[in-house]
Regions:
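Charged, amphipathic alpha-helical interaction segments
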Residues: 39, 399-402
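Short alpha-helix in the alpha/beta-hydrolase fold that links the catalytic acid
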Residues: 251-253, 390-399
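Core-facing hydrophobic residues within beta-strands of well-ordered domains
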Residues: 162, 401-404
Length: 436
Protein backbone atom coordinates (compact mmCIF):
# COMPACT_ATOMS: atom_id res chain seq x y z
CA UNK A 1 0.00 0.00 0.00
CA UNK A 2 1.55 3.29 -1.16
CA UNK A 3 0.28 6.81 -0.49
CA UNK A 4 1.20 10.06 -2.23
CA UNK A 5 -0.16 13.56 -2.66
CA UNK A 6 -1.56 15.54 -5.55
CA UNK A 7 -2.95 19.09 -5.40
CA UNK A 8 -5.84 18.93 -2.95
CA UNK A 9 -5.84 15.14 -2.60
CA UNK A 10 -4.18 12.18 -0.93
CA UNK A 11 -4.03 9.01 -3.02
CA UNK A 12 -3.41 5.48 -1.78
CA UNK A 13 -2.71 2.55 -4.11
CA UNK A 14 -4.22 -0.78 -3.07
CA UNK A 15 -4.05 -4.31 -4.47
CA UNK A 16 -6.49 -7.12 -3.72
CA UNK A 17 -6.31 -10.84 -4.45
CA UNK A 18 -9.51 -12.25 -5.94
CA UNK A 19 -10.35 -15.59 -7.56
CA UNK A 20 -10.41 -15.68 -11.35
CA UNK A 21 -13.57 -17.76 -11.09
CA UNK A 22 -15.72 -16.81 -8.12
CA UNK A 23 -17.38 -20.23 -8.31
CA UNK A 24 -13.97 -21.68 -7.45
CA UNK A 25 -12.72 -19.38 -4.67
CA UNK A 26 -9.72 -21.61 -3.92
CA UNK A 27 -8.65 -21.77 -7.56
CA UNK A 28 -6.45 -19.44 -9.61
CA UNK A 29 -6.08 -15.98 -8.10
CA UNK A 30 -5.67 -12.69 -9.93
CA UNK A 31 -4.93 -9.19 -8.66
CA UNK A 32 -7.25 -6.21 -8.75
CA UNK A 33 -5.91 -2.68 -8.32
CA UNK A 34 -7.83 0.25 -6.86
CA UNK A 35 -6.78 3.78 -6.00
CA UNK A 36 -8.24 5.50 -2.95
CA UNK A 37 -8.67 9.27 -3.27
CA UNK A 38 -9.51 11.53 -0.35
CA UNK A 39 -9.48 15.31 0.05
CA UNK A 40 -6.33 16.75 1.58
CA UNK A 41 -6.83 17.18 5.31
CA UNK A 42 -9.46 14.42 5.38
CA UNK A 43 -7.22 11.36 5.17
CA UNK A 44 -8.03 10.31 8.74
CA UNK A 45 -11.67 11.37 8.68
CA UNK A 46 -14.49 8.85 9.01
CA UNK A 47 -15.89 9.34 5.51
CA UNK A 48 -18.26 7.00 3.66
CA UNK A 49 -16.78 5.15 0.68
CA UNK A 50 -17.82 5.82 -2.92
CA UNK A 51 -16.86 3.11 -5.40
CA UNK A 52 -16.43 4.38 -8.97
CA UNK A 53 -17.16 1.87 -11.73
CA UNK A 54 -15.55 2.98 -14.99
CA UNK A 55 -17.12 2.84 -18.43
CA UNK A 56 -15.98 0.25 -20.90
CA UNK A 57 -15.80 -2.68 -20.78
CA UNK A 58 -12.06 -3.08 -20.66
CA UNK A 59 -10.67 0.24 -19.46
CA UNK A 60 -8.95 1.13 -16.22
CA UNK A 61 -10.26 3.93 -14.03
CA UNK A 62 -9.22 7.54 -14.59
CA UNK A 63 -5.82 8.71 -13.37
CA UNK A 64 -6.65 11.90 -11.47
CA UNK A 65 -4.40 14.90 -11.11
CA UNK A 66 -5.98 17.05 -8.45
CA UNK A 67 -9.75 17.22 -8.15
CA UNK A 68 -10.90 17.61 -11.73
CA UNK A 69 -14.38 16.94 -13.13
CA UNK A 70 -16.82 14.96 -10.96
CA UNK A 71 -14.14 14.01 -8.45
CA UNK A 72 -14.15 17.47 -6.87
CA UNK A 73 -17.86 17.10 -6.02
CA UNK A 74 -17.45 13.55 -4.77
CA UNK A 75 -14.57 14.43 -2.43
CA UNK A 76 -16.78 16.85 -0.52
CA UNK A 77 -18.69 13.90 0.93
CA UNK A 78 -16.81 10.70 0.21
CA UNK A 79 -13.61 8.71 0.26
CA UNK A 80 -13.47 7.61 -3.39
CA UNK A 81 -12.20 4.27 -4.67
CA UNK A 82 -11.25 4.22 -8.36
CA UNK A 83 -11.39 0.57 -9.42
CA UNK A 84 -9.32 -0.87 -12.25
CA UNK A 85 -11.84 -3.55 -13.15
CA UNK A 86 -10.31 -7.00 -13.53
CA UNK A 87 -8.09 -7.30 -16.59
CA UNK A 88 -7.54 -3.53 -16.93
CA UNK A 89 -5.06 -0.89 -15.80
CA UNK A 90 -2.79 -2.13 -13.02
CA UNK A 91 -4.98 -5.13 -12.27
CA UNK A 92 -3.70 -8.46 -13.61
CA UNK A 93 -3.89 -7.71 -17.33
CA UNK A 94 -5.75 -9.79 -19.89
CA UNK A 95 -4.15 -9.06 -23.25
CA UNK A 96 -2.27 -10.69 -26.12
CA UNK A 97 0.94 -10.95 -24.10
CA UNK A 98 -0.47 -12.35 -20.88
CA UNK A 99 -2.79 -14.81 -22.63
CA UNK A 100 -0.35 -15.88 -25.35
CA UNK A 101 1.01 -18.80 -23.33
CA UNK A 102 -2.51 -19.97 -22.47
CA UNK A 103 -3.37 -20.03 -26.16
CA UNK A 104 -0.15 -21.78 -27.12
CA UNK A 105 -0.55 -24.47 -24.46
CA UNK A 106 -4.30 -25.05 -24.40
CA UNK A 107 -5.69 -23.33 -27.49
CA UNK A 108 -8.34 -20.74 -28.32
CA UNK A 109 -11.06 -22.46 -26.29
CA UNK A 110 -9.01 -21.97 -23.13
CA UNK A 111 -8.53 -18.29 -23.97
CA UNK A 112 -12.26 -17.86 -24.52
CA UNK A 113 -13.09 -19.68 -21.29
CA UNK A 114 -10.67 -17.42 -19.42
CA UNK A 115 -12.24 -14.28 -20.88
CA UNK A 116 -15.74 -15.28 -19.75
CA UNK A 117 -14.67 -14.29 -16.22
CA UNK A 118 -14.30 -10.59 -17.06
CA UNK A 119 -17.93 -9.49 -17.32
CA UNK A 120 -20.01 -7.40 -14.94
CA UNK A 121 -20.98 -10.33 -12.71
CA UNK A 122 -17.34 -11.05 -11.86
CA UNK A 123 -16.55 -7.35 -11.44
CA UNK A 124 -19.35 -7.03 -8.87
CA UNK A 125 -18.10 -10.02 -6.91
CA UNK A 126 -14.62 -8.48 -6.91
CA UNK A 127 -16.13 -5.28 -5.54
CA UNK A 128 -17.85 -7.17 -2.74
CA UNK A 129 -14.61 -8.85 -1.66
CA UNK A 130 -12.88 -5.47 -1.68
CA UNK A 131 -15.70 -3.81 0.26
CA UNK A 132 -15.57 -6.41 2.98
CA UNK A 133 -11.81 -5.98 3.26
CA UNK A 134 -11.98 -2.17 3.47
CA UNK A 135 -15.13 -1.68 5.50
CA UNK A 136 -17.91 -3.76 6.95
CA UNK A 137 -20.48 -1.17 5.92
CA UNK A 138 -22.38 -0.80 2.65
CA UNK A 139 -20.83 1.76 0.35
CA UNK A 140 -22.05 4.17 -2.29
CA UNK A 141 -21.59 3.22 -5.94
CA UNK A 142 -21.18 5.51 -8.95
CA UNK A 143 -21.37 3.79 -12.33
CA UNK A 144 -20.65 5.53 -15.64
CA UNK A 145 -21.79 3.86 -18.90
CA UNK A 146 -20.68 0.20 -18.64
CA UNK A 147 -20.03 0.98 -14.99
CA UNK A 148 -23.74 1.75 -14.70
CA UNK A 149 -24.52 -1.68 -16.09
CA UNK A 150 -22.24 -3.10 -13.41
CA UNK A 151 -24.14 -1.06 -10.81
CA UNK A 152 -27.44 -2.63 -11.92
CA UNK A 153 -25.80 -6.06 -11.72
CA UNK A 154 -24.69 -5.09 -8.20
CA UNK A 155 -28.26 -4.11 -7.29
CA UNK A 156 -29.41 -7.46 -8.68
CA UNK A 157 -27.06 -9.81 -6.86
CA UNK A 158 -25.46 -7.99 -3.93
CA UNK A 159 -27.73 -5.09 -2.93
CA UNK A 160 -26.76 -5.57 0.71
CA UNK A 161 -23.37 -4.09 -0.19
CA UNK A 162 -24.77 -0.81 -1.53
CA UNK A 163 -25.76 2.20 0.56
CA UNK A 164 -26.87 4.27 -2.45
CA UNK A 165 -26.34 4.05 -6.21
CA UNK A 166 -25.71 6.75 -8.81
CA UNK A 167 -25.85 5.79 -12.49
CA UNK A 168 -24.85 8.05 -15.38
CA UNK A 169 -25.56 7.08 -18.99
CA UNK A 170 -25.62 3.42 -18.06
CA UNK A 171 -29.08 1.98 -17.38
CA UNK A 172 -28.93 -1.26 -19.40
CA UNK A 173 -31.68 -3.15 -21.15
CA UNK A 174 -32.60 -5.93 -18.72
CA UNK A 175 -33.80 -8.55 -21.20
CA UNK A 176 -33.02 -7.23 -24.70
CA UNK A 177 -30.61 -9.16 -26.91
CA UNK A 178 -27.59 -7.67 -28.63
CA UNK A 179 -29.64 -7.68 -31.84
CA UNK A 180 -32.33 -5.57 -30.17
CA UNK A 181 -29.75 -3.15 -28.81
CA UNK A 182 -27.98 -2.62 -32.13
CA UNK A 183 -31.23 -2.03 -33.99
CA UNK A 184 -31.79 0.91 -31.66
CA UNK A 185 -28.22 2.22 -31.65
CA UNK A 186 -27.81 2.17 -35.44
CA UNK A 187 -30.81 4.50 -35.70
CA UNK A 188 -29.28 6.84 -33.14
CA UNK A 189 -25.90 6.80 -34.89
CA UNK A 190 -27.64 7.64 -38.17
CA UNK A 191 -29.24 10.65 -36.49
CA UNK A 192 -25.83 11.74 -35.18
CA UNK A 193 -24.44 11.56 -38.72
CA UNK A 194 -27.29 13.70 -40.03
CA UNK A 195 -26.71 16.28 -37.31
CA UNK A 196 -22.97 16.31 -38.00
CA UNK A 197 -23.37 16.92 -41.72
CA UNK A 198 -25.94 19.63 -41.04
CA UNK A 199 -23.40 21.32 -38.78
CA UNK A 200 -20.45 20.76 -41.13
CA UNK A 201 -21.78 20.29 -44.70
CA UNK A 202 -18.25 20.61 -46.07
CA UNK A 203 -17.42 17.32 -44.37
CA UNK A 204 -19.61 15.47 -46.87
CA UNK A 205 -17.00 16.07 -49.57
CA UNK A 206 -14.05 15.57 -47.25
CA UNK A 207 -15.27 12.21 -45.96
CA UNK A 208 -16.06 11.01 -49.47
CA UNK A 209 -12.60 12.05 -50.72
CA UNK A 210 -10.96 9.95 -48.03
CA UNK A 211 -13.27 6.99 -48.66
CA UNK A 212 -12.66 7.14 -52.42
CA UNK A 213 -8.91 7.23 -51.84
CA UNK A 214 -9.06 4.24 -49.51
CA UNK A 215 -11.22 2.37 -51.99
CA UNK A 216 -8.45 2.61 -54.57
CA UNK A 217 -5.31 2.30 -52.43
CA UNK A 218 -3.86 -0.06 -49.86
CA UNK A 219 -3.14 2.06 -46.79
CA UNK A 220 -1.50 1.01 -43.53
CA UNK A 221 -1.62 2.80 -40.21
CA UNK A 222 1.61 3.32 -38.23
CA UNK A 223 0.93 0.12 -36.24
CA UNK A 224 0.57 -1.90 -39.44
CA UNK A 225 -3.21 -2.21 -39.33
CA UNK A 226 -4.97 -1.69 -42.67
CA UNK A 227 -7.02 1.47 -43.08
CA UNK A 228 -10.03 0.47 -45.16
CA UNK A 229 -13.29 2.28 -45.82
CA UNK A 230 -15.11 0.39 -43.01
CA UNK A 231 -12.23 1.19 -40.66
CA UNK A 232 -12.46 4.87 -41.60
CA UNK A 233 -16.22 4.78 -41.00
CA UNK A 234 -15.64 3.58 -37.44
CA UNK A 235 -14.12 6.99 -36.63
CA UNK A 236 -17.73 7.95 -35.94
CA UNK A 237 -17.41 6.43 -32.51
CA UNK A 238 -16.60 9.92 -31.24
CA UNK A 239 -19.98 11.34 -32.29
CA UNK A 240 -21.57 10.42 -28.97
CA UNK A 241 -19.46 12.85 -26.93
CA UNK A 242 -20.14 16.49 -26.20
CA UNK A 243 -17.39 17.62 -28.59
CA UNK A 244 -17.46 14.55 -30.81
CA UNK A 245 -18.82 16.23 -33.93
CA UNK A 246 -16.18 18.93 -33.69
CA UNK A 247 -13.45 16.33 -33.19
CA UNK A 248 -14.59 14.46 -36.30
CA UNK A 249 -14.64 17.70 -38.27
CA UNK A 250 -11.07 18.53 -37.29
CA UNK A 251 -10.01 15.03 -38.30
CA UNK A 252 -11.55 15.58 -41.74
CA UNK A 253 -10.51 19.16 -42.43
CA UNK A 254 -6.98 18.37 -43.65
CA UNK A 255 -6.47 14.63 -44.25
CA UNK A 256 -4.17 14.83 -47.28
CA UNK A 257 -0.53 15.73 -47.85
CA UNK A 258 -0.47 16.30 -51.57
CA UNK A 259 -2.12 13.30 -53.21
CA UNK A 260 -1.64 10.93 -50.26
CA UNK A 261 -3.13 10.73 -46.80
CA UNK A 262 -0.94 12.64 -44.37
CA UNK A 263 1.09 11.07 -41.58
CA UNK A 264 -0.78 13.16 -39.02
CA UNK A 265 -4.14 11.89 -40.30
CA UNK A 266 -2.96 8.28 -40.24
CA UNK A 267 -1.59 8.69 -36.73
CA UNK A 268 -4.88 10.22 -35.56
CA UNK A 269 -6.80 7.34 -37.12
CA UNK A 270 -4.53 4.81 -35.42
CA UNK A 271 -5.19 6.44 -32.06
CA UNK A 272 -8.92 6.14 -32.65
CA UNK A 273 -8.93 2.61 -34.03
CA UNK A 274 -6.30 0.77 -31.98
CA UNK A 275 -7.46 -1.31 -29.02
CA UNK A 276 -4.01 -1.34 -27.43
CA UNK A 277 -5.38 0.58 -24.42
CA UNK A 278 -8.34 -1.72 -23.97
CA UNK A 279 -8.38 -5.03 -25.85
CA UNK A 280 -11.15 -6.34 -23.58
CA UNK A 281 -13.41 -3.61 -24.96
CA UNK A 282 -13.38 -5.29 -28.35
CA UNK A 283 -13.42 -8.87 -27.09
CA UNK A 284 -16.18 -8.42 -24.50
CA UNK A 285 -18.28 -5.62 -25.95
CA UNK A 286 -21.02 -7.85 -27.33
CA UNK A 287 -20.64 -10.53 -24.62
CA UNK A 288 -21.31 -7.77 -22.07
CA UNK A 289 -24.92 -7.79 -23.35
CA UNK A 290 -25.33 -11.57 -23.52
CA UNK A 291 -27.70 -13.49 -21.25
CA UNK A 292 -28.56 -17.03 -22.27
CA UNK A 293 -28.02 -16.56 -25.99
CA UNK A 294 -25.21 -16.10 -28.51
CA UNK A 295 -24.44 -12.67 -29.93
CA UNK A 296 -23.01 -14.05 -33.21
CA UNK A 297 -21.37 -10.75 -34.17
CA UNK A 298 -24.64 -8.86 -33.79
CA UNK A 299 -23.32 -5.47 -34.92
CA UNK A 300 -22.12 -6.95 -38.22
CA UNK A 301 -25.37 -8.80 -38.89
CA UNK A 302 -27.71 -5.97 -37.92
CA UNK A 303 -25.73 -3.45 -39.95
CA UNK A 304 -27.04 -5.15 -43.09
CA UNK A 305 -30.53 -3.91 -42.14
CA UNK A 306 -29.38 -0.28 -42.41
CA UNK A 307 -28.44 0.51 -45.98
CA UNK A 308 -27.37 4.05 -45.10
CA UNK A 309 -24.15 2.66 -43.60
CA UNK A 310 -23.17 1.03 -46.89
CA UNK A 311 -20.38 3.28 -48.23
CA UNK A 312 -21.81 2.88 -51.74
CA UNK A 313 -25.18 4.31 -50.65
CA UNK A 314 -26.10 7.91 -49.86
CA UNK A 315 -26.84 8.25 -46.18
CA UNK A 316 -29.14 11.25 -46.56
CA UNK A 317 -31.85 11.39 -49.19
CA UNK A 318 -31.38 14.44 -51.36
CA UNK A 319 -28.33 15.71 -49.45
CA UNK A 320 -25.06 16.19 -51.28
CA UNK A 321 -21.77 17.85 -50.63
CA UNK A 322 -20.58 21.03 -52.32
CA UNK A 323 -19.05 18.93 -55.09
CA UNK A 324 -21.99 16.56 -55.36
CA UNK A 325 -20.64 13.90 -53.03
CA UNK A 326 -23.01 11.46 -51.35
CA UNK A 327 -22.67 11.52 -47.55
CA UNK A 328 -20.63 8.72 -46.03
CA UNK A 329 -22.22 7.50 -42.82
CA UNK A 330 -19.86 6.80 -39.93
CA UNK A 331 -20.53 3.96 -37.52
CA UNK A 332 -20.50 4.14 -33.72
CA UNK A 333 -18.96 1.97 -31.03
CA UNK A 334 -19.86 -1.24 -32.84
CA UNK A 335 -17.34 -4.08 -32.89
CA UNK A 336 -16.94 -6.00 -36.17
CA UNK A 337 -15.08 -9.25 -36.92
CA UNK A 338 -12.68 -7.48 -39.29
CA UNK A 339 -11.43 -5.40 -36.35
CA UNK A 340 -10.07 -8.54 -34.71
CA UNK A 341 -8.25 -9.46 -37.92
CA UNK A 342 -6.91 -5.96 -38.51
CA UNK A 343 -5.65 -4.86 -35.10
CA UNK A 344 -2.28 -6.38 -34.10
CA UNK A 345 -3.29 -6.42 -30.42
CA UNK A 346 -6.48 -8.38 -31.19
CA UNK A 347 -5.32 -10.70 -33.97
CA UNK A 348 -4.07 -13.44 -31.58
CA UNK A 349 -7.65 -13.69 -30.23
CA UNK A 350 -9.37 -14.28 -33.58
CA UNK A 351 -10.47 -17.84 -32.83
CA UNK A 352 -11.29 -17.04 -29.21
CA UNK A 353 -13.44 -14.09 -30.33
CA UNK A 354 -15.45 -16.37 -32.61
CA UNK A 355 -15.91 -18.86 -29.77
CA UNK A 356 -17.20 -16.08 -27.51
CA UNK A 357 -19.56 -14.89 -30.26
CA UNK A 358 -21.09 -18.38 -30.57
CA UNK A 359 -21.34 -19.07 -26.83
CA UNK A 360 -25.01 -19.41 -25.84
CA UNK A 361 -24.88 -20.32 -22.14
CA UNK A 362 -24.04 -16.91 -20.69
CA UNK A 363 -25.42 -16.54 -17.15
CA UNK A 364 -27.86 -13.72 -16.32
CA UNK A 365 -26.46 -10.30 -15.52
CA UNK A 366 -29.63 -8.91 -13.93
CA UNK A 367 -32.38 -10.18 -11.65
CA UNK A 368 -35.66 -8.45 -12.60
CA UNK A 369 -37.47 -9.82 -9.53
CA UNK A 370 -34.82 -8.51 -7.16
CA UNK A 371 -34.78 -5.14 -8.93
CA UNK A 372 -38.57 -4.92 -8.69
CA UNK A 373 -38.19 -5.24 -4.92
CA UNK A 374 -35.18 -2.89 -4.70
CA UNK A 375 -34.85 -0.88 -1.49
CA UNK A 376 -31.47 0.78 -2.19
CA UNK A 377 -31.79 4.54 -2.78
CA UNK A 378 -30.77 5.12 -6.39
CA UNK A 379 -30.80 7.83 -9.05
CA UNK A 380 -29.83 7.79 -12.72
CA UNK A 381 -29.01 10.38 -15.35
CA UNK A 382 -30.47 9.39 -18.72
CA UNK A 383 -29.13 11.40 -21.64
CA UNK A 384 -31.87 12.08 -24.16
CA UNK A 385 -29.59 11.88 -27.22
CA UNK A 386 -27.25 9.18 -25.87
CA UNK A 387 -25.60 7.41 -28.81
CA UNK A 388 -24.23 4.52 -26.79
CA UNK A 389 -27.01 3.59 -24.34
CA UNK A 390 -30.51 3.66 -25.79
CA UNK A 391 -32.80 6.07 -23.96
CA UNK A 392 -35.97 4.02 -24.39
CA UNK A 393 -34.36 0.86 -23.05
CA UNK A 394 -32.97 2.90 -20.15
CA UNK A 395 -36.41 4.21 -19.26
CA UNK A 396 -37.89 0.71 -19.39
CA UNK A 397 -35.22 -0.38 -16.92
CA UNK A 398 -35.81 2.67 -14.74
CA UNK A 399 -39.46 1.71 -14.41
CA UNK A 400 -38.43 -1.86 -13.53
CA UNK A 401 -36.20 -0.85 -10.59
CA UNK A 402 -38.28 -0.02 -7.54
CA UNK A 403 -37.61 3.45 -6.19
CA UNK A 404 -35.09 4.47 -8.85
CA UNK A 405 -35.29 8.18 -9.62
CA UNK A 406 -34.38 9.38 -13.11
CA UNK A 407 -33.23 12.66 -14.54
CA UNK A 408 -33.71 12.75 -18.31
CA UNK A 409 -31.71 15.57 -19.85
CA UNK A 410 -30.63 16.84 -23.26
CA UNK A 411 -28.18 19.26 -21.66
CA UNK A 412 -25.40 16.67 -21.76
CA UNK A 413 -24.25 13.84 -23.98
CA UNK A 414 -22.98 10.45 -22.81
CA UNK A 415 -19.90 12.04 -21.24
CA UNK A 416 -21.93 14.37 -19.02
CA UNK A 417 -20.36 13.07 -15.81
CA UNK A 418 -16.91 14.04 -17.06
CA UNK A 419 -17.67 17.37 -18.71
CA UNK A 420 -20.25 18.85 -16.31
CA UNK A 421 -17.73 19.91 -13.65
CA UNK A 422 -19.58 17.91 -11.02
CA UNK A 423 -23.08 19.15 -11.86
CA UNK A 424 -24.42 15.74 -12.96
CA UNK A 425 -23.19 13.97 -9.83
CA UNK A 426 -24.36 16.81 -7.61
CA UNK A 427 -27.87 16.53 -9.01
CA UNK A 428 -28.01 12.77 -8.48
CA UNK A 429 -26.78 13.13 -4.91
CA UNK A 430 -29.47 15.75 -4.32
CA UNK A 431 -32.14 13.45 -5.75
CA UNK A 432 -31.15 10.53 -3.52
CA UNK A 433 -31.07 12.78 -0.46
CA UNK A 434 -34.48 14.25 -1.22
CA UNK A 435 -33.17 17.74 -1.92
CA UNK A 436 -34.39 17.78 -5.53
Amino acid sequence: MTSFRHPGTVLTDRFFAVPLDHQRPDGEQIEVFAREVVAAGQADADLPWLLFLQGGPGFGAQRPVGREAWLNRALKDYRVLLLDQRGTGRSSPANRKTLARLGEQLGAQAQADYLTHFRADSIVLDAELIRRELTGDPWSVLGQSFGGMCAVTYLSFAPHGIREAFITGGLPALTATADDIYRRTYRTVAAKNAAHYERYPQDVDQARLVADYLDGHEVRLPDGAPLTVPAFQSAGGVLGGADGSHALHYLLEDPFAGEELSDSFLYAMMNQLSFARGPLYALLHEPSYAQGCATRWAAQRIRAEFAEFDPAVSGLDGVQGVEGSAPLYFTGEMIYPWMIDADPVLRPFRKAADILAERDDWPPLYDPARLAANDVPAAAAVYYHDMYVDREFSMQTARAIRGLQTWVTSEYEHDGLRVSDGAVLDRLIGMVRGNI
